[in-house]
């Protein structure tokens, strides 16, 4: 960077417009992780991610290719959360407390003793299916304030990354 650019939490960008795009994709990646857990089960665990201004890439442990209907269910679930315009909140807590609370975390992550836990939802609206947080994850941020800021989420590719590891590439529009 040579002293130029923006750094917010886990993301870096060359300007504010780029940071806004990456922030939308970053929060969408959290929703993708949570949706994969809900659709495929808790054997899913993150192995890595990469966010550019064009797309997010998410690598996770899973032992087979996803079926087209599973990909659609994941994508639909993420978009349902986006349309619900859920509030994204953050709280600081000791790492062990965060893990016990059920917050997702990157197994290779090197975390400080006190971490930020970002939660998406619950919804305050009556009749909402989101009475509990949809996503709860240890992260440095930054994130959108409401999921409605993300835009439409679309999975563009699902493939093998390595033995037992799948990769999803997705965009927001």
How would you describe each model-predicted region?
Residues 1-173:
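A glycine- and charged-residue-rich anion-binding loop/surface
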